[in-house]
A protein has these predicted regions:
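Transmembrane-helix bundle of Major Facilitator Superfamily
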Residues: 2-195
Length: 195
């Protein structure tokens, strides 16, 4: 939780505090989860359409709704984190995203799934600016460069692995269950991040 995050670093630091690297792993796990949520669903769209008898418009909103709410929340959530503390907003974002992933995985209609995707976008909009801000807050100098290098790697891998993981989950669960697994997989990552 937010109270478990170490205090922000002073401008000059000896770089020996290992807690900041644990914080980075938590940040990267959450950002990985939220960005994978964009790409993993792409391969599940046909299964979703069939299972929920969704229209083409419903399918478009599954993708667009997430991006829309993510974009709307992103800047204001980042500013709120700057003013009121990043840790709490980060954990709020992870909680929102995780709960919305449960709702998406259990959705019985296209409308329910779209609502869950809108809410996932809100959660992701909270997670991402706080993660970047906390990297800047906890790391200095060359260590900041390394931390952002890990961040960039997590972003790239999450987007690349999403379709592969989505295909695997659909193959594993079939058309009726596999698409649900593409959302429920985020619950595991979210719970580990919150823990």
């Amino acid at each position: 939780t937010a109270e478990h995050l170490p205090a922000p670093l002073a401008p000059a630091t000896d770089g020996q505090d290992p807690a900041r690297w644990r914080v980075l792993m938590v940040i990267l796990a959450a950002i990985f989860m939220s960005l994978m949520g964009v790409s993993v669903v792409n391969v599940a769209l046909a299964s979703i359409q069939q299972a929920l008898n969704a229209s083409q418009s419903d399918i478009q909103w599954i993708l667009s709704g997430y991006a829309l709410t993510f974009g709307v929340v992103l800047v204001s959530a980042g500013r709120a984190g700057d003013l009121m503390g990043r840790g709490g907003f980060f954990m709020l974002g992870v909680t929102i995203f995780t709960l919305a992933s449960v709702a998406a995985g259990l959705a019985q209609t296209a409308d329910q799934l779209n609502l869950a995707r809108f809410i996932q976008g809100v959660g992701s909009g909270f997670i991402n600016p706080q993660g970047v801000g906390m990297i800047q807050q906890y790391f200095r100098g060359a260590e900041r460069g390394r931390a952002f290098g890990f961040f960039g790697t997590a972003v790239g891998v999450s987007v690349a692995i999403g379709p592969v993981l989505g295909g695997f989950l659909i193959e594993l669960g079939g058309n009726s269950l596999g698409w649900r697994l593409t959302f429920l997989i985020d619950v595991t990552v979210g719970l580990l991040t919150l823990w």
